[in-house]
Amino acid sequence: MFFKTLKEAFKVKDVRARILFTIFILFVFRLGAHITAPGVNVQNLQQVADLPFLSMMNLVSGNAMQNYSLFAMGVSPYITASIIVQLLQMDILPKFVEWSKQGEIGRRKLNQATRYITLVLAMAQSIGITAGFQAMSSLNIVQNPNWQSYLMIGVLLTTGSMVVTWMGEQINEKGFGSGVSVIIFAGIVSGIPSAIKSVYDEKFLNVRPSEIPMSWIFVIGLILSAIVIIYVTTFVQQAERKVPIQYTKLTQGAPTSSYLPLRVNPAGVIPVIFAGSITTAPATILQFLQRSQGSNVGWLSTLQNALSYTTWTGMLFYALLIVLFTFFYSFVQVNPEKMAENLQKQGSYIPSVRPGKGTEKYVSRLLMRLATVGSLFLGLISIIPIAAQNVWGLPKIVALGGTSLLILIQVAIQAVKQLEGYLLKRKYAGFMDNPLETK
């Protein structure tokens, strides 16, 4: 079905242009992800390659951190900045609240504020991570470890992060899907061949013949687990709670009844991306401190281990962030107050529920229940593979396998729905003033 949709999409000029534009942007991103930042000895970086923090950072950067490339920061600073701006709109800063109510003009101001915060965070994060890696490695990761080198690397990585952020915005406007998610999607896909190779090397090379059957059992179990996660995730991400609504007789041209679709997981996969990005922030701060106080400070090491997602405390912290962001982003995606207001303006209502404040409270309660289901689902899918790796000593690629699959599936679902939307537009192009070109 997907390939049929894709084939039909390529027949439409506008859709074809959007697909090719997205592919071009992703090609440029992957090209930049292989250009190592000047002044960095990437071979020595392998000493810290197994750090859980680096794995998480590599995930949210779109697989650009492992080479310490110009795009090593990826969209992580932008994601953190977006969270900050959305929080500031919740009656914290009056100016941001005012902008949030100004429509398109306000949205542009908020986007500009997000860019400025991204710039500051990217600079702080790039210098902090570089200094931290230098402190943790017995070899020089920075070829000339002085403040000029740190500043130069910081400026280069910050510039790269801003370029990647711009790429994401271009995908939003001229391509397919959410730019941030698509960039992370491309990074995950690019890492699949190396992940397969690492499993093959670990399970089938240099092992005793008697261990081969267990290796096959592991691989089959891994494939079956992935299939189950894909099926369950696809089902949950597309499941809806249909709230019946009715129209007053005074509303001309409207049906007598309809329904309001609310997704079982209203927040989608964004909370997982947010949580992954936020978990890198404490590590950045701790690496600043580690650089200034020395690498053998006991309390710093203890705190770093506690916040690492591979430890039980770190797992709980990661799961808690996913739950909190699921509730937060569900109410960002579905605003009960605006929904109640729009229903009232349309002359529609939910049976047995009073219009206005009554509808707002009803939708809020329903959204809380749906967000509870969504948060538990996202948390379990993300945490179970990490716990399995801890308990059974599985290969490290398993740990973030659930998180990676969640992102891959959600981005694929969004892309298919967007394609179907454009094809539906083409189907009814004859009724429009400017039909889509198909040549």
UniProtKB/Swiss-Prot annotation:
Transmembrane intervals: 19-39, 68-88, 116-136, 151-171, 176-196, 216-236, 269-289, 312-332, 373-393, 396-416
Keywords, comma-separated and alphabetical: Cell membrane, Membrane, Protein transport, Translocation, Transmembrane, Transmembrane helix, Transport
Protein name (Swiss-Prot/TrEMBL): Protein translocase subunit SecY
Gene name in the database record: secY
Organism: Lactococcus lactis subsp. cremoris (Streptococcus cremoris)
Membrane topology annotation: Multi-pass membrane protein
GO BP annotation list: intracellular protein transmembrane transport; protein targeting; protein transport by the Sec complex
Keyword Zinc carried by entry: no
Keyword DNA damage recorded: no
Record function comment: The central subunit of the protein translocation channel SecYEG. Consists of two halves formed by TMs 1-5 and 6-10. These two domains form a lateral gate at the front which open onto the bilayer between TMs 2 and 7, and are clamped together by SecE at the back. The channel is closed by both a pore ring composed of hydrophobic SecY resides and a short helix (helix 2A) on the extracellular side of the membrane which forms a plug. The plug probably moves laterally to allow the channel to open. The ring and the pore may move independently.
Family: Belongs to the SecY/SEC61-alpha family.
Pfam families (alphabetical): SecY
Subcellular location: Cell membrane
